[in-house]
């Protein structure tokens, strides 16, 4: 059997020989100094079944060794990593990327058609500059909002952890801490994420990870335009102290003519009124959950008309500005007004200005040595004491310190005999 590359018996002219793999940051690892082994024609691609150069490396400490799974041609056709088959730009599965970009997979599945298609794509890749994807992905216009919201911008290195030790699950692992595999409980076998196929991920069908992300995208909040067509005002919140009116105008002028921009610095918000409803809808669609000015993410909502605010107040029962609330139990009553300057010099107890002097009867126990009163008589009573001339009859006592009966102790004179 001929084994030279020039033999067309097994189409060896199309075998791949590469110098460096196409990897994402997560699969490459956080260590910038890694050793990578290279094996020419070490395995066949799991998509096109052609031999290709296999690279193998360890992405970090206590991580499992990883290797390339598909050839670089299949990787460039889908713009994916050779190991995890996730999109290199967004870090998402191919099914999610194609759904967000409205792409349809037109790759053939049969062996002969797949080989012919791959050769044509290789010719197209060779004629391009190599910086942009080819095929249907290269013809895509722009990224959608869903892809920007679901995009994974930071590497997730936990994906490189070792697999679970099957001996530990059975209780037979004797390596202990030296075991290179994880000693953890495995996931539920009924979990859809436990069954993943590399071909299904590449072709974008029956991918459980993609289904999970698409369900999350369907529950994301959306900014629907109000039914009232007269509303052309947008609310922009979270301005802070650094964003000015000119910076808002520089961003929103691209959507249409701006009538007014009102910045409420105290509330750190602004109201932008457009001349047409179409311009306001376009600004709301392009800016909702995506507006960043001076490194600050701003909140964009639709403004509300005065009629709508009045209806909401009537619905909530708060239309009357003088709404009366129920008094809180346990609070003291209203305090009297403060005294005038003339009265405050002598009236220390907030007594009323007019009225007769009150007589204060003080009942004290008899001094020691005196017997109690006879039966049928009350306790010893002392003559009433008149208050000082500057004190007047006490009115309503508001505080205990205003009670003249509590000002010191009053001792009676002992009776002789």
Swiss-Prot record:
Basic and acidic residues bias locations: 309-318
Domain RRM: 232-305
Keywords carried by this UniProt record: Cytoplasm, Developmental protein, Metal-binding, mRNA processing, mRNA splicing, Nucleus, RNA-binding, Spliceosome, Zinc, Zinc-finger
Region of interest (Disordered), ranges: 303-417
Cell location: Nucleus; Cytoplasm
Segments traversing the membrane: none
Pfam family, one: STL11_N
Compositional bias annotation for Pro residues: 364-391
Coiled coil: none
Example GO molecular function: U6 snRNA binding
Single Gene Ontology BP annotation: mRNA cis splicing, via spliceosome
Chief subcellular location: nucleus
Zinc finger (C3H1-type): 159-186
Domain notes: The C-terminal RRM domain and the zinc finger motif are necessary for RNA-binding.
Subunit annotation: Component of the pre-catalytic and catalytic spliceosome complexes. Component of the postcatalytic spliceosome P complex.
Entry similarity comment: Belongs to the SLT11 family.
Described purpose of this protein according to its UniProt entry: Required for pre-mRNA splicing as component of the activated spliceosome. Involved in the first step of pre-mRNA splicing. Binds directly to the internal stem-loop (ISL) domain of the U6 snRNA and to the pre-mRNA intron near the 5' splice site during the activation and catalytic phases of the spliceosome cycle.
Protein name as it appears in the record: Pre-mRNA-splicing factor RBM22
Gene field: rbm22
């Amino acid at each position: 059997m001929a084994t030279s590359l020039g033999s067309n018996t097994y189409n060896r002219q199309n075998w791949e020989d590469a110098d460096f793999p196409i990897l994402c940051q997560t699969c490459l690892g956080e260590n910038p100094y890694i050793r990578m082994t290279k094996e020419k024609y070490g395995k066949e691609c799991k998509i096109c079944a052609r031999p290709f150069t296999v690279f193998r490396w360890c992405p970090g400490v206590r991580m499992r060794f990883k290797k390339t799974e598909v050839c670089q041609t299949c990787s460039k056709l889908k713009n994916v990593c050779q190991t995890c088959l996730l999109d290199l730009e967004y870090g998402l599965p191919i099914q999610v990327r194609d759904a967000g970009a409205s792409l349809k997979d037109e790759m053939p599945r049969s062996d002969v058609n797949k080989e012919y298609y791959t050769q044509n794509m290789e010719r197209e890749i060779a004629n391009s500059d190599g910086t942009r994807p080819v095929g249907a992905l290269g013809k895509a216009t722009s990224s959608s909002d869903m892809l920007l919201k679901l995009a994974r911008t930071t590497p997730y290195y936990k994906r490189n952890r070792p697999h679970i030790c099957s001996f530990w699950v059975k209780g037979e692992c004797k390596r202990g801490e030296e075991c290179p595999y994880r000693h953890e409980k495995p996931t539920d076998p009924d979990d859809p994420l436990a069954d993943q196929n590399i071909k299904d991920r590449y072709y974008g069908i029956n991918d459980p990870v993609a289904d999970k992300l698409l369900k999350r995208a369907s529950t994301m909040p959306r900014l629907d335009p109000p039914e009232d067509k007269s509303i052309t005002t947008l609310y922009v919140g979270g301005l802070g102290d650094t964003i000015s009116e000119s910076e808002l105008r520089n961003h929103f002028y691209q959507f249409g003519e701006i009538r007014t921009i009102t910045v409420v610095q105290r509330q750190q918000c602004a109201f932008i009124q457009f001349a047409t409803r179409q311009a306001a809808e376009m600004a709301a669609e392009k800016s909702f959950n995506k507006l960043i000015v001076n490194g600050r993410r701003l909140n964009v909502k639709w403004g509300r008309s005065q009629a709508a605010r009045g209806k909401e107040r009537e619905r909530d029962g708060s239309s009357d500005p003088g709404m009366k609330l129920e008094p809180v139990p346990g609070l003291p009553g209203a305090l009297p007004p403060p005294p005038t300057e003339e009265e405050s010099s002598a009236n220390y107890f907030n007594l009323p200005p007019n009225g007769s002097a009150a007589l204060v009867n003080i009942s004290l126990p008899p001094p020691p040595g005196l017997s109690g009163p006879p039966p049928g008589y009350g306790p010893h009573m002392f003559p009433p004491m008149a208050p000082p001339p500057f004190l007047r009859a006490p009115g309503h006592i508001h505080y205990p310190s205003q009670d003249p009966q509590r000002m010191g102790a009053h001792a009676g004179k002992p009776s002789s005999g």
